[in-house]
Design a protein with these regions (language model features):
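Acidic (Asp/Glu-rich) sequence patches and key acidic residues
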Residues: 1-109
Length: 109
């Protein structure tokens, strides 16, 4: 079984009446994969080895909105390790930053 990773550029959909986030709209996404991703996913707390997994840290198949620091870490990781579709991922991150949008990651293994 392989590791499939999606890097998503998105923005929150906010309720005009109460101001709460209703949903996140996906503006663009880039798919990648491979074992090269495991160390990065573990470093941001997305991937947790099975024996250490709890309900709170089980992100399998779920979207994780990255912080600015995690987004910086993602950009540096992609630039250094050159995973599948690295140029597209770096472009997605740059555009998300220019547009003030979120970078979201989702992985299945």
């Amino acid at each position: 079984m392989g590791l499939d990773v999606s890097v998503i550029r998105g923005k929150d959909l906010v309720c005009p009446k109460c101001g709460e986030v209703i949903s996140t709209i996906s503006m663009d996404n880039v798919d990648s994969g491979g074992r090269v991703w495991y160390p990065f996913l573990e470093s941001i707390g997305y991937y947790v080895p099975y024996d250490k997994r709890t309900e709170e840290n089980d992100w399998y198949g779920k979207d994780m909105k990255l912080t600015e620091q995690q987004t910086d870490k993602l950009y540096k990781f992609v630039k250094k390790n050159d995973p599948l579709c690295s140029n597209e991922i770096m472009g997605l991150i740059a555009l998300a930053r220019m547009e003030g949008q979120d970078v979201i990651i989702n992985a299945d293994w």
